[in-house]
């Protein structure tokens, strides 16, 4: 299972979801879907924008866990 740790990174960066959505160029609703793990996928361009906005690596946002 893939776990999305956007909330963890937001807390570390003291950034709001709305601010992140604006920086990345996605809607707050789409960011919410991603944060809750309900997204079926994520574009590399979105992942890249998330990493740039949060000053992190993809592995800081996405984590694989055995079921």
Question: At which residue positions do the language-model features occur?
Answer:
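The alpha-helix within a helix-turn-helix
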Residues: 10, 21, 51
């Amino acid at each position: 299972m893939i776990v999305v740790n956007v909330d963890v990174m937001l807390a570390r960066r003291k950034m709001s979801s709305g601010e992140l959505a604006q920086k990345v160029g996605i809607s707050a609703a789409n960011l919410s879907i991603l944060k809750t793990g309900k997204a079926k996928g994520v574009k590399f361009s979105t992942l890249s924008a998330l990493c740039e906005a949060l000053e992190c690596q993809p592995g800081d946002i996405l984590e694989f866990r055995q079921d």
